[in-house]
Amino acid sequence: MNIFAKQQINNPLSHNKKQLSLKPKTNKKSMANKSGSKSAIKSFPKTFWTVIVMEFLERGSYYGVMSVLGVFLILSGAEGGLGFSKEQAGAILGTIPPLLYFLPIMAGAIADRYGYRKVLFFAFTCMILGYGFTGLSNSYAMIFLSLILMAVGAGFFKPVISGTIAKSTNQENSGLGFGIFYWSINLGAFLFPLILVPILKAESYSYIFYMASSIAFVLLLINLFIYREPVREKTNKSLVQVFSEMLLVLKDWRFILMIFLYSGFWILYFQMFGTVLWYVRDYLDMTPLNNAVNSFLSLFVENPSWKFDVEHVTVINAGVIILLQLIVSNIVKKAPALPTMMAGIGLGTLGMIILSFSASPWVFLIGIMTFTLGEMTTHPKYISYIGLIAPADKKALYLGYSFLYGVIGSSIGGFLGARLYVKYVDELGTPSTLWLILSGIGIFSMVALFLYNKFLVRKTN
């Protein structure tokens, strides 16, 4: 799920997947593996488990909000929403995620200079106020500003947590540590929209934001009384130096071109928080799926009344990742990075094409799951590919700025998706055209990366 966090941890996780997916050939090896896993678990300090809990709570509340935000913005007041236009909603969706991808670069330098706990205090204060005022506000300007404040908090939170994970693990247990970190993110993204969001929005959508604000307050207390800052190397790096490094990376046009081409896939991904949710609300009759799920649930409870709603799109995405990420990573672990990225983009694009086939709930499920398989295939390889093409003395710098795919994909995805939906769905009534146009972006990204691989990478090598 995950948007920024996925990028930060997929590289360590790809190493971890090899550890977790080993199948013992003998009982002795199995016993040794179990013993090693137990000792590795015990090797983590208290600070590690503290930030795992913090990450689970923060990402859970964030994805709980994002799972319904796109719909909350456009619902009428009578339906419990704010009544904004889809273009206005697209502007918000095209602004908030880019901040989450961009701010950690500056926040990391600030945290290294002034201290993790101080930055966390600032981050949680921003989240408390941002989520809280979003739930209280009705005007477009106040909602926009409140969500920007929330994004600032989330953007400053992220590098501190990943930095703490890195400093509270060692060479022997870092793979497992970042693997646990990754699962905590997706577990939060799975459970909060599945359990809390339906209960809260039945009362009021505002309660979802109050929940997120309350959790941010709990995180603030954890930071004050439980979290212990790990030993870190203090730095005097200024923000001017940070931006100077960014300019250095931006001069590598091949690197920037590759990121721009890869960003096409993320234009599709960020439709999961906008156009896909609107499509579920406006076009899909989920009754067959509801009946099937309730028929299964009736084996355990009397008269179940489960109902699929927009927040369950996030649940599907996170759930598929939880179930299949290790399997997918094990399958592609020896495959070359760039061709695997292209294959993953192809799978994601196929998911969008499937959405154009019909408004059947089963077709929709297959499309979203196929897209998620593409996401799981392409993104870990993207991180490893950055490590391959970066100059030997600048690998950390290049990996730090590989976030640009999220800035480009989310900003274009938010604004473009809203405009396309209004034209082809609201005005023309042809949602299939919307999905095919978006699929065209995925095809362009895949073909362009193929040409990049053939004509630029080989010449460079």
Name each region found by the language model:
Residues 125-139, 346-359:
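C-terminal ends and interior cores of transmembrane alpha-helices
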Residues 156-170, 377-391:
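Intracellular juxtamembrane helix-capping segments at the cytosolic ends
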Residues 175-200, 215-219, 402-414:
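Glycine-rich segments within core transmembrane alpha-helices of 12-TM secondary carriers
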Residues 91-109, 315-327:
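Central cavity-lining transmembrane alpha-helices of secondary-active solute carriers
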Residues 1-6, 10-46, 170-175, 196-273, ...:
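Intracellular loop-helix junctions on the cytosolic face of multi-pass helical membrane proteins
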Residues 67-88, 274-308:
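Short amphipathic helix-loop junctions that connect adjacent transmembrane helices
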Residues 102-138:
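Conserved MFS/SLC helix-loop-helix module at the cytosolic interface between two early adjacent transmembrane helices
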Residues 198-214, 419-443:
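A membrane-interface helix-boundary motif in multi-pass transporters
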